[in-house]
Amino acid sequence: MALKGNLAVFTTTQLLNLINLSKRSGSLTIFEGVETGEKMMLGDGRTQIDKLVAGKPLARLNFREGKLVFAEMQSKDGHLASILQRSGKLNEEQSRLIRQRAEALKMSDKGLALSLINANYVTQKDIIQSIQKHTVSIVFDLMTWKREPFEFKEGDQAPASRILVPIDLRNIIIEGTRIQNEQLELEKEIPNLDMALRFAEDPSSFKNIKLGANEWRVVGFINPKNSIRQIAKACNMTDTEIRRIVYALLQAGLVQMVKPQVEAKRRPDIRHPVPRNTPDRDVVNRLITKIKTINKTP
Amino acid sequence: MQTVKMVITGPFSSGKTEFIKTISEIDVVSTERSITPDSVESQEKSETTVAMDFGRITVDNDLVLYLFGTPGQRRFDFMWEILAEGMLGFVVMVDSSKPETFREARSILETFRAYAPTPYVVAANKQDHADAWKPEDLRIALRIEDENVKLLPCIATDIEYVREVLLELLYSILEEMDSN
Ligand SMILES: Nc1nc2c(ncn2[C@@H]2O[C@H](COP(=O)(O)OP(=O)(O)OP(=O)(O)O)[C@@H](O)[C@H]2O)c(=O)[nH]1
Ligand SMILES: [Mg+2]
């Protein structure tokens, strides 16, 4: 049976937790989220979010009995030579040459690892640690993804030619929770995305400030009429991404948050216990007997 | 004559009305309202329950069970408290094929538990759907750690499942009596 959804409603951390607790074997694919223009209704029958369908696969994780054994991500070069270079075990030149040779000889990662160990380039431990680091960095990346569709398929085996390094998910989950706490902090700092921004001073003061491309895009939309949410949408950013940037701009004193034109109304949650009838055992037993006999054909 | 009631709750479109329809001996007195045809809700279905659903099971001359279904849209949740009053127990219906509603299911569950500490079961509905999550996975997704809380597979249109869900709720009620 499928385990399908998207990260907006079921987070990477929740997924890993589920796979860990149920000791699953299988593969988890995360896809590019393709806009459909349609909306998806959440369970409150009121809130709508963009409905995304699965586009091309962006990342894949393989699990065996609840342990992560392999991860690849489109945006992260997963060739063993590159992995070893990123962890400092090979320099750039070595990595390039080794990769060329491996590709010319059509060597698998496993074959390459063996010949590197035999040639005393690296140790087995280097290889395992480097792959582990690579795998974990992919997972941490995934934990910041917020809307991509995913699918878990049972029993799918990890690619035979790749080196599998089993990793206990619990540590990753704990670390991931820390990352998410950072997001919660940001949410506390900027709780309401319906607020707008305005420049603290003359926008020309931005001239001497070094901003990244993403920051500039946000700055371009700053106007008391635009809510932060609208800016995020215009810049195609997730809530966390926009919060991070707005937070930095606020900290730097470049912008100020201004009151939204329409404040969202929130009804207080009324939760007082209601009177309870304690039924007697006889009543419950009669109900059971009755319900057992109901056999309507629809 | 004694009447007792159970509440069938859960997120929007999870199958509450269907569940009650399947087992009620009367036509469900439903307060359905058509959904505006071009709204997002209408991609899901054409009608939603506005105030409540109301079904009945007559046990004998002096005992009647009423089944109340809560409205799915949160803007009607002022009804919840009224419906929860005096209930024997409740069923949380979840559309197992819609993870986007799990968070709400969890929140509804918490709210009802706060209203009254009665026994409840969770029905992993729409198990006939190709994308349905398994009950075991739903348990983890909804963070129902308490092993005593039953998570049951359900197809709300199928009397066998509906009967089983209600029976399991009644067994839970008995178990609770035994433990007190
Ligand atoms: N395949 C399948 N469809 C179901 C099942 N249960 C309900 N449905 C369908 O799901 C849709 C929603 O069911 P309803 O019974 O109206 O759900 P509800 O929880 O009463 O909805 P609201 O009152 O709007 O919150 C309807 O189209 C039902 O026919 C099920 O077990 N399997
Ligand atoms: Mg209904």
Regions flagged by a language model, labelled:
Chain B
Residues M1-S46, G55-T58, V64-Y66:
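Conserved G1/Walker A P-loop phosphate-binding module
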Residues V7, V121-V122, K150-L152:
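A structural signal for isolated positions on well-ordered beta-strands in alpha/beta enzyme cores
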Residues T49, T58-N61, E81-G86, F112-A116, ...:
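Conserved catalytic network of the ASCE P-loop NTPase/AAA+ motor domain
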Residues V59-D77:
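Switch II (G3) loop of P-loop NTPases
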Residues D62-L65, L88-G89, T118-V121:
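Loop/turn-to-beta-strand initiation segments
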Residues R75-K98, T111-Y115:
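Inter-motif core of Ras-like GTPase G domains
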Residues V94-E147:
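Conserved C-terminal guanine-recognition region of P-loop GTPase G domains, centered on the G4
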Residues D128-N180:
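Canonical P-loop GTPase G-domain recognition
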